[in-house]
Amino acid sequence: MTINLHRPDIAELKPRITVFGVGGGGGNAVNNMINAGLQGVDFVVANTDAQALAMSKAERVIQLGAAVTEGLGAGALPEVGQAAADECIDEIIDHLADSHMVFITAGMGGGTGTGAAPVVARAAREKGILTVGVVTKPFQFEGARRMKTAEAGIEELQKSVDTLIVIPNQNLFRIANEKTTFADAFAMADQVLYSGVASITDLMIKEGLINLDFADVRSVMHEMGRAMMGTGEASGEGRALAAAEAAIANPLLDETSMCGARGLLISITGGRDMTLFEVDEAANRIREEVDADANVIFGAIDDESLEGVIRVSVVATGIDRLASDVVQPSHSKFQKSVSSVRKNDSGINQTASHPQSSQLRSESMVETIESLEVEVSQSQPVEEMFSPKSQIFAKPTDTASTSSRSAATYPFGHGQSDIYGKISNASRIQVNSIPQQSTAAAVSMEATAHVLSEMTNIVEQSEEKQAQIQPYIAPARMPELKDFSPFTHGQGIHSSGLEQGPRSLWQRLKQSLTYREEIEPEARLEPAVKPLQNEESHIYNKNVQKVSSQDSSVYAPHRSTKLQSRALQDQRAFVNEEDQLEIPAFLRRQAN
């Protein structure tokens, strides 16, 4: 009796990933991925063009619509491509068997890719395969009709896939230069597909420090709508942050934003020198871009071949909003109001009921504000200087000339002082700070003009009252001897002579003879002011006379009382001096 021993059959438990290229663009993407050496995936190419299939490097190819197109292309007709795919649906399902995840890549805008890709996606979804679509949009120079066809195909494909990634070919100009060849540009676009597939393959196949499997990938990408993929590599100082920035800022992807992502898959790969702080820095930088409630799955892989380099791969899913909707929210009411204001030439928002009156009122307000601005800019505030309370120390000529000059320079209604100068400066600031071209100034210009007009009227009225009541105050100076009356001069000289001591007979005789000559008529207490030629200074002359009369009561000596006291002092001094003098006896006897 023979006993046969053999090993039991063990089913392969590793997930199977298939890259399905549809049409000419999909076939070229598969060829570029094969040339790049991507491992761990199966490649399938399906096309209606027999000549393009002959150039494919994939092991499995599908001739679509042999009876419909007879080996020719679809002629940029999506209906033909769809019919060709429906003809070969059984063969497509056979190639999708035993697959856990399928990437469908195609170029939108043509016939085969636009029409056949949704058919392949529906077949994969019906078999429960996680389906991810990676498609391109045509260039701008290919025309608007091809772009409309591509958008319609993308809309149809999105209904049949779990996650969709769109790469506009026009974005190739962001990274290309004048020396970039046409083939190299398409290879750059295919690099997005390659990096996304490679990152997911590494997560599911390679063993890492933080291991992820296909179940984690499915939870992030199942029925998530629009998505984005990105990979960044960096070395040197700050390499972790630089790699994360490059991963989330892929210039080739469609105008999408990670702010509304509901699922996030982060894969960080590095050598033995990758530190914990670098992993934390890169992961936190990416996590800041998504919603706080997003499903974040993180994986880390140790690869000895990446010594000194950190690679960060990101897959963000559930992005259903455009970047323009996130950055610039649209408010129809606000935009309508702004447009209506910009159409108004005068800068005031016009109402529908009275458009003509509002326009006239706004134009008059603008003219009033401009005139006020010119007048305020021409006026200069006068600095206030110290002056004594009395007007007796002021120079008469300076008073007259300054008064006339002040009246000529600052007419009534526009005179400036220290107090009102501040108000004028404030009004000037308000006038200059009104941007007449901005929408905010257009709304508030009416109220500002009303306030400025009221302020101007108040200033003019107060300045007129101030000019009528308050006289001109001359600058302070030290009084001189010539400013006093001649009687004061004589009194000072005579008093200085009394202080010298007893006088001789000749001095007394000389004093008695010259005493009456020294006494002059009553001195003028008021300064000799020249008559003002300007009639506007009449009020000022009255004010000066009133103040001078008040000062005379303080400084002017009373003539009657002063002369009497002076005569008594002279008689007493004469008697005392006569007794002190040595008069000869014969003169004394003759006098008696």
Swiss-Prot record:
InterPro entries named among the record's database cross-references: Cell_div_FtsZ, Cell_div_FtsZ_C, Cell_div_FtsZ_CS, FtsZ/CetZ, FtsZ_C, Tub_FtsZ_C, Tubulin/FtsZ-like_C, Tubulin/FtsZ_2-layer-sand-dom
Localization (cell): Cytoplasm
Taxonomy, superkingdom: Bacteria
Keyword Nucleotide-binding: yes
Annotated region described as Disordered, given as residue ranges: 333-362
Pfam families noted in UniProt: FtsZ_C, Tubulin
GO biological process, any: protein polymerization
Keywords: Cell cycle, Cell division, Cytoplasm, GTP-binding, Nucleotide-binding, Septation
Disulfide topology: none
MF-aspect GO terms: GTP binding; GTPase activity
Entries under PROSITE patterns matching the protein: FTSZ_1, FTSZ_2
Similarity annotation: Belongs to the FtsZ family.
Protein name listed in UniProt: Cell division protein FtsZ
Gene giving rise to this polypeptide: ftsZ
